[in-house]
């Protein structure tokens, strides 16, 4: 199993309930594909660097997880089909990125 991090941006016109429903849908999808969730972060509504689909902001979310390599392609296919999804990016984490992510989680936990 490899370590991955996925950041996705949801449409800013969604209600809180729709956002929670969408995030839960993709978390469940990953778990059904054999992934183990390491961390989830809700970065909230943020301004975009440039307009996407005529929108200037979006709700950012981050998933960090361990998954088999064949789980990523179906996830990204589902992202492409989702109307609520504006953008997404999945990266495979190397040992340095894993260490940095652990530091980030620890720092965020201390702030909370």
Curated annotation (Swiss-Prot):
UniProt keyword list: Ribonucleoprotein, Ribosomal protein, RNA-binding, rRNA-binding
Entry GO terms, CC: cytoplasm; ribonucleoprotein complex; ribosome
Entry keyword annotation includes Mitochondrion: no
Gene Ontology BP, a term: translation
Gene3D superfamilies linked to this entry: 3.30.70.60
SUPFAM superfamilies referenced in this protein's UniProt entry, alphabetically: Ribosomal protein S6
InterPro entries: Ribosomal_bS6, Ribosomal_bS6_sf, Ribosomal_S6_plastid/chlpt, Transl_elong_EF1B/ribsomal_bS6
Superkingdom, natural source: Bacteria
GO MF term (any one): structural constituent of ribosome
Record flagged with keyword Ribonucleoprotein: yes
Role: Binds together with bS18 to 16S ribosomal RNA.
UniProt family annotation: Belongs to the bacterial ribosomal protein bS6 family.
Protein name: Small ribosomal subunit protein bS6
Lineage of the species this protein comes from: Bacteria, Pseudomonadati, Bacteroidota, Flavobacteriia, Flavobacteriales
Gene coding for it: rpsF
């Amino acid at each position: 199993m490899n370590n991955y991090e996925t950041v996705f941006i949801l449409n800013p016109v969604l209600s809180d309930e729709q956002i929670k429903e969408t995030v839960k849908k993709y978390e469940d999808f990953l778990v059904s594909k054999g992934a183990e969730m390491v961390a989830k972060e809700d970065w909230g509504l943020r301004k975009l660097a440039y307009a996407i689909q005529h929108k200037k902001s979006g709700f950012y979310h981050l998933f960090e997880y361990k998954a088999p390599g064949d789980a990523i392609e179906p996830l990204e296919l589902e992202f492409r089909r989702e109307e609520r999804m504006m953008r997404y990016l999945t990266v495979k984490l190397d040992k340095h990125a894993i260490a940095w992510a652990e530091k980030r989680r620890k720092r965020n936990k201390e702030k909370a």
